[in-house]
Amino acid sequence: MSRVSQARNLGKYFLLIDNMLVVLGFFVVFPLISIRFVDQMGWAAVMVGIALGLRQFIQQGLGIFGGAIADRFGAKPMIVTGMLMRAAGFATMGIAHEPWLLWFSCLLSGLGGTLFDPPRSALVVKLIRPQQRGRFFSLLMMQDSASAVIGALLGSWLLQYDFRLVCATGPVLFVLCAAFNAWLLPAWKLSTVRTPVREGMTRVMRDKRFVTYVLTLAGYYMLAVQVMLMLPIMVNDVAGAPSAVKWMYAIEACLSLTLLYPIARWSEKHFRLEHRLMAGLLIMSLSMMPVGMVSGLQQLFTLICLFYIGSIIAEPARETLSASLADARARGSYMGFSRLGLAIGGAIGYIGGGWLFDLGKSAHQPELPWMMLGIIGIFTFLALGWQFSQKRAARRLLERDA
């Protein structure tokens, strides 16, 4: 086996262990924020939505800068620094008794993510061969789901005793992850050339097709982020106990572990990436619309199952499509910019979702936020369909001219 092949094989295992620690550390804390501050402390959902949206926007919106810096200086220093900053943010959350302190903790957490997330994504693109990426992203999603439910179960158990225990466990896991990267991650370059920061960012901004695709995905993310805000609140309201939230993540884990890889393997043989992304988004959108009308936990979990199935279909295709569109000369910059859709969609989804949830509750129209999210998903579906049809038309024109 050549040294390159050996490095790729070892890199896969490194990426899987690193991903497990990151997801565990995140899901021990974040799914319980809305339960802690909305249900236990009585804050308005929009206040918590601002905090979650701030974290999302900072982490993903500034991702292009983190990616461009990583293109210049390498992945290792960015990842280690970002992990430690995320740990500090989670620790601060444990003493948040005023909204501004929660916002500050989410700001720290987001800045940490800005540093470590783009280079980690770029390492996947660097180490995994193009024909294997779809399956590897599926494996990562399966691991995400299993780690998420373990993290949520651990966090829910700790919440029974003290929220500060929740906010101590998350930082410990991120410090462990920082040490793991500092010890084992080689000083790899992310791009084929050492790209100056400004050049990497400029290269991305000139790629109009990639920019349009990323910005359109904001609508997709408005729906996706509700697993952190409105869906846990809804499950808690219907069940009458925060412990029911862990079953929501258990459903996701079961579906991902049993369906994700088989669906990905089958669909990649029969459907284009664009079609898989759009089909998943359509299922997610349609499953959102009736959520506000249900009153039983069984009905709610059925809709959540449909939502997760849509995500299982869409997410590996979205990741693979984003990676395939990235320029190898500026991988970090591309993968950083690819998070901008999540920054915009996540911020609007959290803040707007929280505001609509409060508005629907006060107006006795609980279906309002869910119908709006479903409509946004349908419009995003149509916009993506138009973009992909334009791309196919341009390809046919080039083939005819040739």
Swiss-Prot record:
Organism domain of life: Bacteria
Gene3D superfamilies tied to this protein: MFS general substrate transporter like domains
Family in the record: Belongs to the major facilitator superfamily. DHA1 family. MdtH (TC 2.A.1.2.21) subfamily.
Gene Ontology CC annotation, any one: plasma membrane
Protein name as catalogued: Multidrug resistance protein MdtH
Periplasmic face of the membrane: 34-98, 160-164, 235-243, 298-299, 361-367
UniProt keyword annotation of Transmembrane present: yes
Keyword annotations of the record: Cell inner membrane, Cell membrane, Membrane, Transmembrane, Transmembrane helix, Transport
Membrane topology, record value: Multi-pass membrane protein
Pfam families in the cross-refs: MFS_1
GO molecular function: transmembrane transporter activity
Membrane-spanning segments: 13-33, 99-116, 139-159, 165-185, 214-234, 244-264, 277-297, 300-320, 340-360, 368-388
Cytoplasmic-facing ranges: 1-12, 117-138, 186-213, 265-276, 321-339, 389-402
Compartment list: Cell inner membrane
NCBIfam families assigned to the protein according to its UniProt record, in alphabetical order: PRK11646.1
